């Protein structure tokens, strides 16, 4: 946009549309594998069925952790644990959303032992990727 000397700008007649990021682009920005939150229709803990929709994906990704930093941190934590003689460390996850910490832990060779979340969609995403054991 270029401002004119007497006010206004040279692009008064041009309308601008800002494109919303897709859930796939949001997954990539947060460091998740493509399609991580694309779980289709799902059933919550009370047995209620939910249709496939982008809204819970956006919310879950917005409330999630950015994996690159936590990957860096987990690699260093794992090294410290192994340097202290703990060969097979296990770690837990508390309120991380869509399984971000278990994903990071497993990438570092650490066994995630449990995950806790209070919202239904993130619970469903975590169960899809890690099963019922978390």
Regions found by a protein language model. Give the residues of each.
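C-terminal target-recognition/interaction regions appended to catalytic cores
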Residues: 1-96
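Core alpha/beta nucleotide-donor-binding catalytic domains of modification enzymes
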Residues: 81-134
